[in-house]
């Protein structure tokens, strides 16, 4: 039985927990929760019968195998360091934190030193296996075009001074590097960092706000010595958090199941 603790108790954490609770094979179980908003952690703990922790230190000190970070990019460094130092592997959902190359290298070296693992799910995009394999050759271009409903980008756009009520047709709201994208859309474009890490090449990112779209669309183009990889995924937004896709949570659930299975499919 894989014993799991969860940091961050929002929509993604709830989806992951409920899926594992309903898993008939019962090879993994969430045993403890922590959130900076203690009420959220206490509520989810009461709903599931798991422990409610009042601090991250309390969570990582428990008898757990794996910590799942579902909080925010700002929570990643502390969560990963404390988890690794307490002999626990970590799944990082807020992978946008790794747009900071220095942070990624720091945590990579710590995990290597301690003999622990940091897992990054594929998230809401397809083709990561092929992109990782292709990165063994020479990559010459990586682009990501993400189109989302306006309401899913609303908070990020308004922070940049854009009135979302004025967007009546599909509008390009960002074009630039993966590093710029994650700084302006930290809750919307984690997939760009996953793609860049998998390809070992900095992705060019375009973000489109579409008032008529009901799904989150991610189009990937990768060119290199292996040829061309093109994928397009249209994901249903998470019901409780339209900034992200339900598939992002499902990718973490599948990763957890893979960790407890004797056979693993895919790269």
Curated annotation (Swiss-Prot):
Gene Ontology terms for molecular function: aspartate dehydrogenase activity; NAD binding; NADP binding; oxidoreductase activity, acting on the CH-NH2 group of donors, NAD or NADP as acceptor
Catalytic function, reaction form: L-aspartate + NADP(+) + H2O = oxaloacetate + NH4(+) + NADPH + H(+); L-aspartate + NAD(+) + H2O = oxaloacetate + NH4(+) + NADH + H(+)
Keywords for the protein's UniProt record, in alphabetical order: NAD, NADP, Oxidoreductase, Pyridine nucleotide biosynthesis
Positions of NAD(+) binding: 124, 190
InterPro entries (UniProt xref): Asp/hSer_DH_NAD-bd, Asp_DH, Asp_DH_arc, Asp_DH_prok, L-Asp_DH, NAD(P)-bd_dom_sf
Positions of the catalytic residues: 218
Family: Belongs to the L-aspartate dehydrogenase family.
More info: The iminoaspartate product is unstable in aqueous solution and can decompose to oxaloacetate and ammonia.
Name under which the protein is recorded: L-aspartate dehydrogenase
Source organism: Methanococcus maripaludis (strain C7 / ATCC BAA-1331)
Organism lineage string: Archaea, Methanobacteriati, Methanobacteriota, Methanomada group, Methanococci
Gene name per UniProt: nadX
